[in-house]
């Protein structure tokens, strides 16, 4: 199940707004496969990774790109607690993400099929190029089996187990732009459809 949503998640980049310049913005190929993303030069992967976050965060963020072995490798240490990667789910567009340490822990737990995330504080992650999620029978689901891929606009996330009953927040995408994804599961988190590139 985790292999379908890594970090949320969330999501293959729609690259819906390629004309808007972001930190390190250098448009990648639309529809690039994960294999093609991993084959990109260090410069191009870095530009793609940094395009996930607002400029003031991206300029001091750490960077991890795919090496020759296909694994993420750190090429720049973070000076502000955030780390950016060039793609997450890639269905089929690159969906770069910039995340803090709490989200990195959340991601690790998800990948390791942990029963619940172990981050002790809410985590913040940015996806300024947007992403996607799986929907089945009108609901956002974690598994891609039998589900359709739905594109998402630029957004940011708060990785914390928000409870819909307690917060009264929606549990599906809606005009307000805010909802709890995976509500009812330990990996529930808040989605905010707001372009991180416009945040200062």
Regions found by a protein language model. Name each.
Residues 1-8:
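Bacterial N-terminal signal peptides that target proteins for export
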Residues 2, 17-18:
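Position-driven detector of the extreme protein N-terminus
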Residues 8-17:
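Bacterial N-terminal signal peptides
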Residues 19-25:
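Boundary at the C-terminal end of the N-terminal hydrophobic targeting segment
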Residues 25-200:
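Primary mode marks residue(s) on the alpha4-beta5-alpha5 output face of response regulator receiver
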């Amino acid at each position: 199940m985790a292999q379908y949503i890594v970090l949320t998640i969330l999501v293959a980049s729609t690259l819906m707004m390629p004309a808007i310049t972001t930190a390190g913005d250098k448009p990648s190929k639309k529809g690039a496969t994960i294999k093609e993303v991993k084959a990109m030069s260090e410069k191009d992967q870095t530009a793609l990774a940094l395009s996930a976050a607002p400029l003031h965060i991206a300029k001091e963020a750490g960077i991890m790109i795919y090496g020759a072995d296909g694994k993420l490798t750190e090429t720049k240490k973070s000076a502000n607690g955030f780390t950016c990667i060039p793609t997450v789910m890639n269905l089929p567009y690159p969906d770069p993400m910039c995340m803090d340490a709490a989200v990195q822990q959340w991601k690790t737990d998800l990948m390791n099929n942990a029963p619940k995330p172990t981050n002790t504080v809410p985590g913040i992650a940015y996806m300024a190029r947007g992403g996607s999620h799986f929907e089945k029978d009108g609901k956002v689901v974690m598994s891609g089996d039998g589900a359709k891929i739905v594109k998402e606009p630029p957004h940011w996330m708060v990785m914390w187990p928000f409870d819909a009953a307690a917060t009264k927040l929606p549990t599906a995408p809606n005009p307000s732009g805010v909802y709890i994804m995976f509500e009812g599961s330990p990996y529930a988190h808040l989605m905010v459809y707001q372009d991180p590139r416009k945040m200062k």
